[in-house]
């Protein structure tokens, strides 16, 4: 999709998308926006007002009206924003996506989108609208065999012009916002496609190849550690999980450094990279559950998607992107329940459940990250079903002992629209991981499962500020909603980018 910036007003075009705030009272005749009311009276003989009245459109959130017309504007979409005082960037994204879905239903190829006057930061509004346009248009047809099937599943809208009031006064700022949206959406789409691809396509080797491609395209440093290198570093937890797979483990380390000048801060982003999780000898028995275990590398996908976006945006920040990639399979080499593994920080782990393998791979990844001397570590993982039970399928769980980091990540999530909710790191629950033969077990009681999982990870970070995002719920959706289509969402990429850019801005001001 091509995106352009231009000045209002609406003049002519195939399709116009116009935002509408909710009418006061909400039950009377809806007042059309002035620009549309004028067109309706002069060119459309009141057809728009009549249709709006018939359909009961009142400008409420998630509501819209789509019409075919004659004249210089041949198709029109009105989309509701609700109460202007309650409008958020995420509501603007969702309304934009709703409107573009309606434009798609009209088979529109070109859309003129008139940005509303709101209380939101206008530059941020342009970024949010552009993100929604690019993300709702994404269709993953890689594995369809026929051109006809691909055409039927493609998004009709190919070009959107954003009409921005006051564009001329701050065009450079708007162009920066547009480019940021383009790169963030591209990173999100990369993450979506990694998560959506089956485990026979996205293997540990394929993730490593993706990292190499990013390094080549964006000038990143890349280090891929194989079995022997990981053994030399004492990564017994990671390699314990990897033992049963016929595919070799790949420990991925991408590094971005500013081209000029010293970095204002150094950060590590760590993603869980289980390209398939059978459960191991504690095999998953639910056929639906095991079929979806291609998504168990959603954290790795978010980290690689963020690497793609941030390398293009070039912040003055040193960034380390880390993924311990492997499968959790069943074979004669598989770890047994009761085995003891030694992680690279020399802590020992009794494996009382082989289906709690992600935290084992993350243990060595976190130790590796801290040794890099970074200022903060953030890991993302599709870690626990318990978090999905607690927060549902749209919200990630945030765990951190660091108040500043918690606030930073919440602010980043507010900007991205990717929902997070902080859950407690209740230290007393670590008793549930106690072992009589090792330093800890890898799982505790069923109750508080997402908390004990986070407490387990905490044992592998000594001093560096650290946060953990459990993204098991929002990494996938079973319905078209907002700018996400059914399937992989690419969750986490935009929050990571917003967090890194905010850390850069804060460091530059200090």
Swiss-Prot record:
GO biological process annotation, one example: proteolysis
GO cellular component, one term: cytoplasm
The EC number(s) this enzyme carries: 3.4.11.1, 3.4.11.10
A Pfam family of this chain: Peptidase_M17
Gene Ontology molecular function: manganese ion binding; metalloaminopeptidase activity
Stated name of the protein: Probable cytosol aminopeptidase
Subcellular location: Cytoplasm
Disulfide cross-links: none
UniProt keyword Metal-binding, yes or no: yes
Catalytic reaction(s) noted: Release of an N-terminal amino acid, Xaa-|-Yaa-, in which Xaa is preferably Leu, but may be other amino acids including Pro although not Arg or Lys, and Yaa may be Pro. Amino acid amides and methyl esters are also readily hydrolyzed, but rates on arylamides are exceedingly low; Release of an N-terminal amino acid, preferentially leucine, but not glutamic or aspartic acids
Active-site residue numbers: 284, 359
InterPro entries registered for this protein in UniProt: Leucine_aapep/pepB, Macro_dom-like, Peptidase_M17_C, Peptidase_M17_leu_NH2_pept, Peptidase_M17_N
Predominant subcellular localization, coarse grouping: cytoplasm
Its job: Presumably involved in the processing and regular turnover of intracellular proteins. Catalyzes the removal of unsubstituted N-terminal amino acids from various peptides.
Positions contributing to Mn(2+) 2 binding: 272, 277, 296, 357
Cofactor requirement: Mn(2+)
PROSITE patterns to which the protein is assigned, alphabetical: CYTOSOL_AP
Cofactor note: Binds 2 manganese ions per subunit.
């Amino acid at each position: 999709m091509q995106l352009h910036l231009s000045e209002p007003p609406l003049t002519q075009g195939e399709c116009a998308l116009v935002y509408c705030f909710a009418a006061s009272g909400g039950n009377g005749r809806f007042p059309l926006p002035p620009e549309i009311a004028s067109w309706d009276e002069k060119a459309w003989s009141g057809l728009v007002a009549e249709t709006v009245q018939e359909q009961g459109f009142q400008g409420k959130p998630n509501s819209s009206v789509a019409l075919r017309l004659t004249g210089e504007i041949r198709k029109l979409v009105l989309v509701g924003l609700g109460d202007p005082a309650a409008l958020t960037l995420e509501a603007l994204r969702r309304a934009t996506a709703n409107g573009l879905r309606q434009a798609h239903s009209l088979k529109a190829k070109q859309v003129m989108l008139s940005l509303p006057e709101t209380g939101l930061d206008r530059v941020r509004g342009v970024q949010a609208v552009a993100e929604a346009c690019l993300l709702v248009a994404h269709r993953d047809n890689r594995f369809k065999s026929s051109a006809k099937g691909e055409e039927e599943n493609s998004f009709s809208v190919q070009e959107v012009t954003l009409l921005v009031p006051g564009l001329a006064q701050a065009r450079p700022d708007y162009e920066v916002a547009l480019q940021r949206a383009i790169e963030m959406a591209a990173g999100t789409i990369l993450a979506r496609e990694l998560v959506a691809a089956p485990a026979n396509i996205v293997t540990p080797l394929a993730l490593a190849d993706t990292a190499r491609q990013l390094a080549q395209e964006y000038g990143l440093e890349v280090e891929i550690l194989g079995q022997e290198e990981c053994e030399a570093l004492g990564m017994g937890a990671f390699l314990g999980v990897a033992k049963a797979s016929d595919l070799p483990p790949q420990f991925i380390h991408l590094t971005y450094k500013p081209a000029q000048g010293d970095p204002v801060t150094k950060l590590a982003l760590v993603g869980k990279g289980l390209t398939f999780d059978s459960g191991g000898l504690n095999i998953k028995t639910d056929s639906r559950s095991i079929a979806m275990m291609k998504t168990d590398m959603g954290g790795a996908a978010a980290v690689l998607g963020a690497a793609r976006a941030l390398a293009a945006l070039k912040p003055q920040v040193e960034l380390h992107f880390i993924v311990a990639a492997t499968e959790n399979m069943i074979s004669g080499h598989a770890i047994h329940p009761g085995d003891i593994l030694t992680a690279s920080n020399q802590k020992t782990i009794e494996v009382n459940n082989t289906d709690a393998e992600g935290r084992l791979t993350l243990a060595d990844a976190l130790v590796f990250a801290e040794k890099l001397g970074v200022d903060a570590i953030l890991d993302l993982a599709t870690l626990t079903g318990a978090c999905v039970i607690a927060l549902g399928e749209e919200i990630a769980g945030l765990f951190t002992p660091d108040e500043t980091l918690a606030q930073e990540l919440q602010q980043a999530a507010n900007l991205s629209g990717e929902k997070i909710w902080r859950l407690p790191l209740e230290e007393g629950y670590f008793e549930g991981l106690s072992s009589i033969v090792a330093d800890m077990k890898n799982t505790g009681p069923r109750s508080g499962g997402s908390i004990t999982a986070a407490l387990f990870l905490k044992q592998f970070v000594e001093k560096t500020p650290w946060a953990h995002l459990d993204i098991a719920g929002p990494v996938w959706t079973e319905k078209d909603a907002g700018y996400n289509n059914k399937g992989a969402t690419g969750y986490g990429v935009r929050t990571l980018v917003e967090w890194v850019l905010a850390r850069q801005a804060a460091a530059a001001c200090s």
